[in-house]
């Protein structure tokens, strides 16, 4: 998608030197064809499964990129009310949006419930109770999954590890069953699944396989 022509770098046949003269520099230039290709690689690999691929807006919240993924049928993984609003603005259906992240505030929880998103990934018992309270106040049901810490050595950079028992994210795997039982007894909570995030910069599926087991 990127190539040199007459010693000038091009992106999808667009001369980036000429583009810089129009928009100024520095600037960001993204190839929609590359985005489409990478998305297709994922969906094709799991075409036999009932799978929803969600683009993580924290990776890049450029509105045009979100719209590109929306046009491909992608869902969205968001970590703030701002990202949630950007996903909705890009016409990603609410039932394809997952709200992850720590420290969700009351306004974010209420907005997510009102917009009937796919699920809220719950980080702690206190957050679960907060979601339940707000859902009851709205007379609505809040779909949730629990972020479970599987105590897995993912193999990435230790400083960005999120899946070991000493890491401060999620609910420990030893407590998970009890918290799921608690959630099942809350009238305004609907359990939709389980959430696991073990880290970044992982280049094999080994750690993911271990966490699933």
Predicted regions and their residues:
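Conserved anion-binding
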Residues: 127-183
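Conserved radical SAM core fold
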Residues: 62-65, 83-85, 105-108, 150-165, ...
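A charged N-terminal "starter" segment
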Residues: 1-142, 181, 185-191
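Short beta-strand segments
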Residues: 56, 143-149, 195-197
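Generic structural "secondary-structure junction" signal
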Residues: 11, 29-30, 59, 154, ...
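Short, histidine-centered active-site or binding-site loop motifs used for metal coordination
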Residues: 23, 195-200
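Conserved small/polar residues in nucleotide/adenosyl-binding loops
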Residues: 203-210
């Amino acid at each position: 998608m990127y190539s040199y022509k007459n010693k000038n770098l091009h992106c999808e046949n667009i001369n980036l030197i000429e583009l810089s003269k129009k928009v100024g520099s520095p600037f960001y230039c993204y190839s929609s064809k590359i985005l489409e290709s990478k998305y297709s690689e994922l969906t094709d690999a799991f075409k036999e499964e009932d799978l929803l691929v969600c683009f993580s807006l924290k990776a890049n919240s450029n509105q045009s990129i979100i719209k590109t993924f929306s046009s491909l049928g992608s869902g969205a993984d968001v970590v703030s009310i701002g990202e949630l609003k950007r996903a909705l603005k890009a016409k990603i259906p609410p039932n394809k949006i997952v709200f992850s992240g720590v420290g969700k505030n009351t306004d974010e929880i209420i907005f997510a419930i009102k917009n009937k998103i796919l699920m809220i990934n719950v980080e702690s018992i206190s957050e679960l109770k907060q979601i339940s309270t707000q859902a009851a106040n709205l007379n609505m049901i809040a779909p949730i999954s629990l972020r479970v810490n599987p105590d897995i050595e993912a193999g990435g950079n230790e400083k960005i590890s999120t899946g070991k028992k000493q890491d401060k994210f999620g609910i420990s795997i030893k407590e998970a069953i009890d918290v799921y039982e608690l959630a099942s007894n809350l009238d305004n909570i609907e359990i939709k699944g389980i959430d696991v995030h073990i880290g970044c910069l992982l280049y094999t599926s080994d750690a993911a396989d271990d966490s699933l087991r």
